């Protein structure tokens, strides 16, 4: 494409043409800099969604979003082994904060976690909401987050703090009220750029697209979608998994029952308001057994599996991860991780304001 303008990009999308990475990066740059108007943002998002986003197009959006992000500069060796445990949200299931709890379990097992998230979108309690309720300050800057990762084994990048340019798209997204490409960017745009991730996606078409972006940049990731629609490794149905590693993507259908996890129902995993979900975190860390623990264990196991080879048969890696995850809770390591994290975060908070 020659000179990039909104009419040119929109016309191409309406024809059904695939945009190149530079095209979508340009569009995202215009949006995040505040140069795009509401009609241009809405037209682009809807036209791209109607055509169907491709890995190439999504990669351009991700590239521009990271360019405009406030970076978290982790040491190279830490970034190479750190993992994000995150979901796109949007599954409308209103579960407890499974990925948040799994993050604490993974960190308790000795793997550094850099979590990227926001307040609730489709549910009543997002990652940021429950962490804030538990005592974690959300206004930490990049240096403070890096300190948390180094000293507590876990840090949280509050999306609103690290992607300020996304405020220009917020009103349009709310008015549209339907999922667009913006709904799938969060897990791909962690400002700390960890090289591994266990990533939930509610959309069956977009999950392999996200996996292809992870693969293209050399990350090790498991993209997860429950057959019940959960953006997690579900225990209420089989889970479709896209394993991205070494530049390739492999798809598999797994069932938590094959790992010895009892079948649950979505009602077993239902959450509530922020106080309810925070109490669920405390009960899990105190050793309470049941469906919530089971769901947390299998999602933590998926994150731990990304630290090694993602072979065609993931069962062995997941079973090993389940043992490590259970020990993280039962030894008290996960609970101590939360306590240490809050302590470090409160200590470094003044430097981040």
Swiss-Prot record:
<dbReference type="GO" id="GO:0004048">
    <property type="term" value="F:anthranilate phosphoribosyltransferase activity"/>
</dbReference>
<feature type="binding site">
    <location>
        <begin position="90"/>
        <end position="91"/>
    </location>
    <ligand>
        <name>5-phospho-alpha-D-ribose 1-diphosphate</name>
    </ligand>
</feature>
<comment type="similarity">
    <text>Belongs to the anthranilate phosphoribosyltransferase family.</text>
</comment>
<dbReference type="InterPro" id="IPR036320">
    <property type="entry name" value="Glycosyl_Trfase_fam3_N_dom_sf"/>
</dbReference>
<feature type="binding site">
    <location>
        <position position="173"/>
    </location>
    <ligand>
        <name>anthranilate 2</name>
    </ligand>
</feature>
<dbReference type="Pfam" id="PF02885">
    <property type="entry name" value="Glycos_trans_3N"/>
</dbReference>
<comment type="function">
    <text>Catalyzes the transfer of the phosphoribosyl group of 5-phosphorylribose-1-pyrophosphate (PRPP) to anthranilate to yield N-(5'-phosphoribosyl)-anthranilate (PRA).</text>
</comment>
<keyword id="KW-0028">Amino-acid biosynthesis</keyword>
<keyword id="KW-0808">Transferase</keyword>
<dbReference type="GO" id="GO:0000287">
    <property type="term" value="F:magnesium ion binding"/>
</dbReference>
<comment type="pathway">
    <text>Amino-acid biosynthesis; L-tryptophan biosynthesis; L-tryptophan from chorismate: step 2/5.</text>
</comment>
<protein>
    <recommendedName>
        <fullName>Anthranilate phosphoribosyltransferase</fullName>
        <ecNumber>2.4.2.18</ecNumber>
    </recommendedName>
</protein>
<keyword id="KW-0822">Tryptophan biosynthesis</keyword>
<feature type="binding site">
    <location>
        <position position="232"/>
    </location>
    <ligand>
        <name>Mg(2+) 1</name>
    </ligand>
</feature>
<dbReference type="InterPro" id="IPR000312">
    <property type="entry name" value="Glycosyl_Trfase_fam3"/>
</dbReference>
<dbReference type="GO" id="GO:0005829">
    <property type="term" value="C:cytosol"/>
</dbReference>
<dbReference type="Pfam" id="PF00591">
    <property type="entry name" value="Glycos_transf_3"/>
</dbReference>
<keyword id="KW-0328">Glycosyltransferase</keyword>
<feature type="binding site">
    <location>
        <position position="99"/>
    </location>
    <ligand>
        <name>Mg(2+) 1</name>
    </ligand>
</feature>
<dbReference type="GO" id="GO:0000162">
    <property type="term" value="P:L-tryptophan biosynthetic process"/>
</dbReference>
<comment type="subunit">
    <text>Homodimer.</text>
</comment>
<feature type="binding site">
    <location>
        <position position="118"/>
    </location>
    <ligand>
        <name>anthranilate 1</name>
    </ligand>
</feature>
<keyword id="KW-0460">Magnesium</keyword>
<dbReference type="InterPro" id="IPR017459">
    <property type="entry name" value="Glycosyl_Trfase_fam3_N_dom"/>
</dbReference>
<keyword id="KW-0057">Aromatic amino acid biosynthesis</keyword>
<feature type="binding site">
    <location>
        <position position="95"/>
    </location>
    <ligand>
        <name>5-phospho-alpha-D-ribose 1-diphosphate</name>
    </ligand>
</feature>
<feature type="binding site">
    <location>
        <position position="127"/>
    </location>
    <ligand>
        <name>5-phospho-alpha-D-ribose 1-diphosphate</name>
    </ligand>
</feature>
<keyword id="KW-0479">Metal-binding</keyword>
<feature type="binding site">
    <location>
        <begin position="115"/>
        <end position="123"/>
    </location>
    <ligand>
        <name>5-phospho-alpha-D-ribose 1-diphosphate</name>
    </ligand>
</feature>
<feature type="binding site">
    <location>
        <position position="232"/>
    </location>
    <ligand>
        <name>Mg(2+) 2</name>
    </ligand>
</feature>
<dbReference type="InterPro" id="IPR005940">
    <property type="entry name" value="Anthranilate_Pribosyl_Tfrase"/>
</dbReference>
<feature type="binding site">
    <location>
        <position position="231"/>
    </location>
    <ligand>
        <name>Mg(2+) 2</name>
    </ligand>
</feature>
<feature type="binding site">
    <location>
        <position position="87"/>
    </location>
    <ligand>
        <name>anthranilate 1</name>
    </ligand>
</feature>
<dbReference type="InterPro" id="IPR035902">
    <property type="entry name" value="Nuc_phospho_transferase"/>
</dbReference>
<feature type="binding site">
    <location>
        <begin position="97"/>
        <end position="100"/>
    </location>
    <ligand>
        <name>5-phospho-alpha-D-ribose 1-diphosphate</name>
    </ligand>
</feature>
<feature type="binding site">
    <location>
        <position position="87"/>
    </location>
    <ligand>
        <name>5-phospho-alpha-D-ribose 1-diphosphate</name>
    </ligand>
</feature>
